[in-house]
Amino acid sequence: MALPRLTHLQFLVIAELSRGSARGRHLRGCLEEAGVRQSGPAFYQMMAGLEDAEYVSGWYEQQIVDGQIIRERHYKVLAGGKRAWRESRDFYLRVIGVPRPGLAYGA
């Protein structure tokens, strides 16, 4: 049984992105709600790794707030990220002895 390719933090991020694209700030908030304390640079370094692995795609969106141009990073999950997430989920389900979702017991 091969180990999962995703870390626990990457697993959480891809799970959130499976709901739809999101801003980096939103994803950091989700990690905080899960009890993860991570600096901004560490978060964006992790996201760059997910982009390099072609698990997520990132882009900047620009808006003007109080006369200032603000660029925010947005992300969406790619097919490779969904596959890596499912493989990680299935790994942990096997470890605890739970059948994979969608399969009949004993299949």
PLM-predicted stretches and their roles:
Residues 29, 51-52:
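Alpha-helical residues within the helix-turn-helix
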Residues 2-42:
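N-terminal helix-turn-helix DNA-binding core of bacterial DNA-binding proteins
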Residues 80-107:
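Amphipathic alpha-helical dimerization/coiled-coil segments
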Residues 6, 68-70:
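Short coil/turn motifs at beta-sheet boundaries
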Residues 44-48:
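Short, hydrophobic-biased segments on the C-terminal half of alpha helices
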Residues 53-68:
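Beta-hairpin "wing" of winged helix-turn-helix
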